[in-house]
Amino acid sequence: MTQPTILITGANRGLGLKFTELYAQKKFNVLATCRAPQNAERLLQLAEQSDLISIYPLDVGINEEIEDLSHKIKDVPIDILINNAGIWRSSSLGSANKQAWLESFAINSIAPYEVIQTLLPNIKMGVLKKVVSITSKMGSIDDNTSGGSYIYRSSKSALNMVMRSLENDLRPYDIATLTLHPGWVQTDMGGMNALINDEQSVSGMIEVIDALNIKNSGRFIDYAGKHINW
């Protein structure tokens, strides 16, 4: 097998940066994407240390940038695609801003679909054929026992439904899908009071992704491999 290739969105910090680091250590060719590479100091440092990391500009909320990326990597097989880019907008009862809600749906729910759809020819060319979207247990309808966080919860619930549909539509191409909860992680989004660090989360998620195949495709699980109800 030739050296596998992985594409990661939101690779400039947090989980995306750690995915980039650890997959490069696993000898993957890493296509690391983010909105403003020129400002991504830690990602640029990783790329200087490894010739396996290539950086591409990508704002997942702008379709033209997704199309531009697809042209740049037109003939590159993608073995694993990780939709990691996402945003958090605070919202409680009485404070859910409509514009913030629409923005969250655009980035958290629609953009992963757009990225997958546009890069589908590359994924079909890959050997491993795995599509992963980083979601949250907060998007689980079954698990919602505390309310609040209307914007984030609903945007991730929508992403979960997108991934359920994609599981059916991509299966004929032998493309396996995974909807993955990273845990509560100490990142800019998760905060420093979170339960685990990025190394623990991403190392666990990589093990789960390693085990992904067409037979167990379509699951919603966490970084430790634990099943989550939709």
Language model: regions and residue ranges:
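Rossmann-fold cofactor-recognition segment
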Residues: A47-E64
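Conserved glycine-rich Rossmann-like NAD(P)H-binding loop of the short-chain dehydrogenase/reductase
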Residues: A24-R42
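Conserved Rossmann-fold cofactor-binding substructure of NAD(P)-dependent oxidoreductases
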Residues: D59-V76
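Catalytic loop of short-chain dehydrogenase/reductase
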Residues: I87-F105, K124-R171
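N-terminal Rossmann NAD(P)H-binding glycine-rich loop of SDR-like oxidoreductase domains
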Residues: N12, G16-E21
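C-terminal helical subdomain
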Residues: T179-P182, G191-W230
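Hydrophobic positions on the long internal alpha-helix
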Residues: I82, V115-L119, I123, V162-M163
